[in-house]
Amino acid sequence: RSVKLLSEEENVKNKIWQQTRLHEYLNEMPVSQILIEGIEADDIIAQICNEMYVGDYEKVIVSSDKDFIQRCDNSTVLYRPIQKKVLNKNTVIDEYKISPNWFALARAITGDKSDNLAGVGGVGLKTIARRFPFFSDPHRASCFYQLYEHCRENIDGPKVYKTVLENKDLVESNYKLMQLYAPSMSPQNKSII
């Protein structure tokens, strides 16, 4: 029967059945699974990248979610299957003119439609790359102070600087939700990983 013809209740049951089957299949393969109730997969993946035991092993994140771009570094790459692209720290800078260590802040400014997070109106990644050139510096850690200071210094310039300053609360709220550098997770949940 076509999934399109299922009732809402049947659709939910079908999804549960699919997830159960996938879990069973993966149990038969050399694949590790980590499921923690109440914790999103992206936070678990980010925490694994932070763990000492994975050290400098090359890590490959497979996802089309732009949130993972911020995790690209010398030992972590992102494979985006829908786009058929592999991103690393250098390709992110080449493509977006924004370093992965600034990417969460850039996306906090632009918002994320897929996560239903509004951004600062009229500001996209290209505008950020053009108006905030220090976002491309892989040796500079991102911080709100540098962003706001740059905006104050250029307040009489293009409108973007004033608009970002007027939306500081939105940017900071978005950042807390979007950043995967230090995922919020209890020590008990971290110990599971």
Model-found features: residue ranges?
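Extended two-metal-dependent nuclease catalytic cores across DNA- and RNA-processing enzymes
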Residues: 5-190
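Non-catalytic, usually N-terminal nucleic-acid engagement modules in DNA/RNA processing proteins
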Residues: 1
